[in-house]
Regions:
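Short, positively charged and aromatic/hydrophobic N-terminal segments
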Residues: 3-5, 9-13
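Cysteine-centered iron-sulfur cluster-binding motifs in ferredoxin-type domains/subunits
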Residues: 29-45, 65-81
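Pre-active-site segment of Zn-dependent metallo-hydrolases
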Residues: 115-116, 126-154, 187-191
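Zn-dependent metallo-beta-lactamase
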Residues: 13, 22, 67-127, 266-269, ...
Length: 307
């Protein structure tokens, strides 16, 4: 990897120009062949990055300062350091942008981890104590910024795939980790608050854990203030289908269980879906329920076709 554009920190490397993908347009920004197609760069800077088969490439060089800033945030977030600049642009301001507010006190952390295949993680900033949902990279500037925001009281781990650097985060902040017992395994030990059963669990007045087995046996989503659903890998917005979506292709435990888990969500109100993988969605209550019902119908249809 090329030297850091972020002021010497070891957490932020750049891609190698000799590995630059041929599909990149000419210019400063590029993606190299270590890209794992996590989609985050396309979410953060859609005017710059696009899909090319099973990887991302630069389809258009940034045309404005805002466009360049978005591309640099994608560089910082990239879990595999697959984005680079020929001129080694400084990413200090992009580093300082995270955690980045999505809505009110809910933030996206950037700094995705390769060990969670580039999953998104989130921070809920609240007077009762901040909640880290799934794990970003344990990167010094992000740690410092979260310290400034009040630290982390609780880590909510939706499932076994997206735990990344959970031990480092929990140890640094003395945070209580919450995870369903059915997803605890040798790589995830020392969970302070293991959840059990299939019934919803009120963690605090504004936080409800809803077990949603399917993607994994112990997958659990987090509902915050009946407004934000942190959905892990259970549910996401599909850019291709323009709808809420789940896929049997990434269901590692039970598709029939995942359908039943999806039906459970009809009992709740929320207007945001904030996934680990896939796109975010914000819809009004009626549209969210309509989308959810349609997703369930497609899942059942897919199940019948498979049978």
């Amino acid at each position: 990897m090329a030297s850091s554009p972020c002021g010497g920190y070891t957490y932020c490397h750049m891609a190698l120009p000799e590995l630059r993908l041929a599909e990149n347009v000419a210019g400063n920004f590029y993606v190299d062949n270590t890209c794992i197609d996590c989609d985050l760069c396309r979410q953060i800077a859609p005017d710059v990055f696009t899909s090319a088969g099973d990887q991302s490439v630069v389809s258009r060089q940034p045309q404005t300062p805002d466009g360049e800033f978005a591309a640099l945030k994608a560089l910082v977030t990239c879990p595999t350091a697959s984005i680079g600049t020929v001129d080694h642009l400084s990413a200090k301001e992009a580093v300082a942008a995270y955690p980045e507010a999505i809505d009110q006190n809910v933030c996206f952390n950037g700094f995705a981890s390769e060990s969670s295949y580039g999953a998104s993680s989130y921070l809920i900033v609240r007077p009762e104590g901040n909640v880290l949902v799934d794990s970003p990279r344990f990167a010094r500037p992000l740690v410092k910024r979260i310290e400034e925001l009040g630290g982390v009281r609780m880590m909510f781990l939706t499932h076994r795939d997206d735990v990344a650097d959970h031990e480092k985060w929990a140890g640094h902040f003395n945070a209580q980790r919450v995870m369903h017992r059915d997803d605890i395994h040798r790589a995830v030990t020392g969970i302070e608050r293991p959840l059990t059963g299939c019934d919803p669990i009120k963690l605090e007045d504004d936080l409800v854990a809803v077990p949603t087995p399917g993607h994994t046996r112990g997958h659990t989503v987090l509902l915050y203030r009946n407004r934000y659903l942190f959905s892990g890998d259970h549910l996401w917005w599909s850019a291709n289908y323009k709808s809420l979506h789940a896929s049997s292709n990434v269901c590692w435990y039970s598709w029939s269980e995942q359908i039943r888990s999806m039906e459970k969500l009809l009992d709740y109100e929320f207007e945001w879906v904030l996934p680990g993988h896939g796109r975010r969605a914000r819809l009004n209550d009626r549209e969210m329920m309509n989308q959810l019902e349609s997703a369930i119908a497609r899942m059942k249809s897919q199940s019948r076709l498979a049978g």
